[in-house]
């Protein structure tokens, strides 16, 4: 007979109740190259695809440095470095206006997620479905470990906290191995052993996006846990760095370096080759570098709001007909005020150089600009 002290009676009863319903066994997925359900391009993008069907180069090379790439309003991929390729699912242009229509392949990347990013992903995407077994989740780092707390729901709601070691499997999955579990504030490991339970028997994760369980270990597919745009890549390492969980994909020498026109910018996105489509613009044999209009460390960017960022900035054409785009960082949009629908771009009357990219062109009245600047009115591109 198992003796249970009165102080753990509530926790024991809850854990025992969890054992009444057992889900079918979960299997750890092997290397999975799928990127979820693929949505076809819009009718407009399809027409553009036909128009460029004769082009043999449908892949766009991409390089990023120090970019906070927002995938949902409260979660970003903290891209330290990225070298990869982009392509449309249907061939033809990569269309920025349809993030379901293209994929980013990571040949090499170092990408961080902080506790707030993971928390938002867990609650707003991974477990955002009716009847999810986990809710009200919070995640943070502690030393070299990850701490997750929240509510486990089966028959009753059970508050829990799990402290876990983190590693990468040969298949490229993120493995969370619990080293301490608290249920109702008491030792959850002892309770689960007493009732011959495991997380695999307790949690039905069949509807969760990119998460599986085996025994007491949780496995996260680092690309399937993310909303669009789709990402392909094989995680090769993971570490805790301050408040971030930093993932390494691929190998640093997988592709040759891709050097942007402006090497002085520490934070940028650079696209080269293939065909890019955004707003009303179609760029063949693309060469476009995007930098922060007011640089201050990492560049905050969102596909969902890139038009606002673009309209608040300006662009210039380079001598080789490439495009240099100065966007206002997402974090600065709220402080920029309402942006007029009639915007200004400028170039020096001599044509020798362009506007200072560190100035606030998008919000500064033309009357305040230096006299040696030539002012041209342009309309938004969308």
Locations of the language-model features?
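Bacterial Sec-dependent signal peptides at the C-terminal "C-region" and cleavage site
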Residues: 15-30, 45
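Extracellular/lumenal and peripheral-membrane lipid-interaction modules
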Residues: 29-382
């Amino acid at each position: 007979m198992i003796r249970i002290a009165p102080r753990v009676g509530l926790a024991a009863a809850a854990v025992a109740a969890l054992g009444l319903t057992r889900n079918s066994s979960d299997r750890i997925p092997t290397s999975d190259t799928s990127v979820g359900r693929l949505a076809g391009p819009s009718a407009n993008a399809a027409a553009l695809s036909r128009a460029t069907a004769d082009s043999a180069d449908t892949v766009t090379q991409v390089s990023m440095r120090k970019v906070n790439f927002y995938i949902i309003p409260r979660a970003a991929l903290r891209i330290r470095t990225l070298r990869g390729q982009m392509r449309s699912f249907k061939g033809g242009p990569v269309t920025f206006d349809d993030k379901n229509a293209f994929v980013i392949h990571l040949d090499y990347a170092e990408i961080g997620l902080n506790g707030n990013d993971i928390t938002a992903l867990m609650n707003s995407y991974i477990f955002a479905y009716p009847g999810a077994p986990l809710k009200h989740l919070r995640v943070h780092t502690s030393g070299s470990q990850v701490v997750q707390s929240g509510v486990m729901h089966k028959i009753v709601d059970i508050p829990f906290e799990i402290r876990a070691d983190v590693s990468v499997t040969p298949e490229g999955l993120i493995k969370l191995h619990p080293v301490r579990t608290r249920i109702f504030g008491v030792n959850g490991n002892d309770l689960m052993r007493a009732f011959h339970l495991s997380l695999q028997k307790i949690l039905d994760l069949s509807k969760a996006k990119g998460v599986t369980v085996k025994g007491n270990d949780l496995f996260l597919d680092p690309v399937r846990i993310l909303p669009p745009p789709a990402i392909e890549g094989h995680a090769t390492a993971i570490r805790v760095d301050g408040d971030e969980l930093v993932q390494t994909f691929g190998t640093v020498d997988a592709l040759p370096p891709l050097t942007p026109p402006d090497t002085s910018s520490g934070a940028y996105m650079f696209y080269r080759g293939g065909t890019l489509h955004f707003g009303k613009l179609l760029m063949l044999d693309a060469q476009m570098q995007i930098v922060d209009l007011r640089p201050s460390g990492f560049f905050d960017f969102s596909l969902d709001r890139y038009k606002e960022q673009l309209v608040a900035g300006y662009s210039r054409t380079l001598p080789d007909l490439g495009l240099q785009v100065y966007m206002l960082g997402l974090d600065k949009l709220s402080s920029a005020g309402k942006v007029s629908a009639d915007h200004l771009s400028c170039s020096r009357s001599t044509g020798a150089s362009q506007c200072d990219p560190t100035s606030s062109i998008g919000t500064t009245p033309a009357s305040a600009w230096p006299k040696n600047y030539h002012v041209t009115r342009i309309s938004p591109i969308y």
